[in-house]
Amino acid sequence: EAAIIAMRKLPNVIMPFPGGVVRSGSKVGSKYPALFASSNDAYCPTIRGITKTELLPDTSSVLEIVIDGLTEADIRLAMRVGMQAVCKLGAKRGVQKITAGNYGGKLGQFHFKLREIMK
């Protein structure tokens, strides 16, 4: 929520999901042909016992923020502002890790590398 509040102050970007935040991570594709996306089981805390997980042992929630922007620069700025807002919360407020998916290039030509964005 802190990231959404910070990013909503910027022009040219929207976070299209209600409230701006999506529970659990998503991935491109599904075992059902009609579905374009599905939950990313590696980042879904509720099924960690039945699938390979990428989560830390004490992670109980994964949140995803989808950003749509007019330009690549607009999206990079929104990502930076959002990550800075989340980092200010820190581990004591529950932040363990920030990651980004690239989906193997299946969602477009742009790749946003977090370390580069935060420089």
For every predicted segment, state its role.
Residues 1-64, 68-112, 116-119:
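Conserved mixed alpha/beta catalytic, RNA-binding, or beta-rich assembly cores of soluble enzyme
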